[in-house]
């Protein structure tokens, strides 16, 4: 899980979602998981 000020899609499988007010990226590639903070 990467924590970044700006989260971006890193590939076509990445999905930008909101969970509990936090912007997150979920992906089939675990290295692409990100959370805003």
UniProtKB/Swiss-Prot annotation:
Record flagged with keyword Protein transport: no
Predominant location: plastid
Subcellular location as annotated: Plastid, Chloroplast
Superkingdom classification of source: Eukaryota
GO biological process: translation
Pfam families: Ribosomal_L36
Gene Ontology annotations for the cellular component aspect, listed alphabetically: chloroplast; ribonucleoprotein complex; ribosome
Gene Ontology MF terms: structural constituent of ribosome
Keyword annotations from UniProtKB, A to Z: Chloroplast, Plastid, Ribonucleoprotein, Ribosomal protein
Entry annotated with the keyword Ribonucleoprotein: yes
Family annotation (NCBIfam families): rpmJ_bact (TIGR01022)
Family label: Belongs to the bacterial ribosomal protein bL36 family.
Protein name stated in the entry: Large ribosomal subunit protein bL36c
């Amino acid at each position: 899980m990467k924590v970044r000020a700006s989260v971006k899609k890193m590939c076509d499988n990445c999905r930008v979602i909101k969970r509990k007010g936090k912007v997150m990226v979920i992906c089939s590639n675990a290295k692409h998981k990100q959370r805003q903070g």
